[in-house]
Amino acid sequence: LTCKTCPFTTCPNSESCPGGQSICYQRKWEEHHGERIERRCVANCPAFGSHDTSLLCCTRDNCN
């Protein structure tokens, strides 16, 4: 599986997930400087946090 890895809306960077991590993840939240984005490979989809504005977990290449 290959997942996007950069903290921007448009994300050209991706990486192959290590063994045991078969989910692509994207989390967005608001900070005083604007929207923040985190993208990476994970083993389990995390819980939706109280400050999150969106949370995406998917299992196709570059789906995050």
UniProtKB/Swiss-Prot annotation:
<dbReference type="GO" id="GO:0090729">
    <property type="term" value="F:toxin activity"/>
</dbReference>
<protein>
    <recommendedName>
        <fullName>Micrurotoxin 2</fullName>
    </recommendedName>
</protein>
<feature type="disulfide bond">
    <location>
        <begin position="58"/>
        <end position="63"/>
    </location>
</feature>
<dbReference type="InterPro" id="IPR003571">
    <property type="entry name" value="Snake_3FTx"/>
</dbReference>
<dbReference type="Pfam" id="PF21947">
    <property type="entry name" value="Toxin_cobra-type"/>
</dbReference>
<keyword id="KW-0964">Secreted</keyword>
<dbReference type="InterPro" id="IPR045860">
    <property type="entry name" value="Snake_toxin-like_sf"/>
</dbReference>
<feature type="disulfide bond">
    <location>
        <begin position="3"/>
        <end position="24"/>
    </location>
</feature>
<keyword id="KW-0872">Ion channel impairing toxin</keyword>
<feature type="disulfide bond">
    <location>
        <begin position="45"/>
        <end position="57"/>
    </location>
</feature>
<dbReference type="GO" id="GO:0099106">
    <property type="term" value="F:ion channel regulator activity"/>
</dbReference>
<comment type="function">
    <text>Allosteric modulator of the GABA(A) receptor (GABR), possibly increasing receptor affinity for the agonist, thus enhancing receptor opening and macroscopic desensitization. In vivo, intracerebroventricular injection into mice results in periods of reduced basal activity, followed by bursts of intense seizures and death.</text>
</comment>
<keyword id="KW-0800">Toxin</keyword>
<comment type="similarity">
    <text>Belongs to the three-finger toxin family. Ancestral subfamily.</text>
</comment>
<dbReference type="GO" id="GO:0005576">
    <property type="term" value="C:extracellular region"/>
</dbReference>
<dbReference type="InterPro" id="IPR054131">
    <property type="entry name" value="Toxin_cobra-type"/>
</dbReference>
<keyword id="KW-1015">Disulfide bond</keyword>
<feature type="disulfide bond">
    <location>
        <begin position="17"/>
        <end position="41"/>
    </location>
</feature>
<feature type="disulfide bond">
    <location>
        <begin position="6"/>
        <end position="11"/>
    </location>
</feature>
<keyword id="KW-1265">Chloride channel impairing toxin</keyword>
<keyword id="KW-0528">Neurotoxin</keyword>
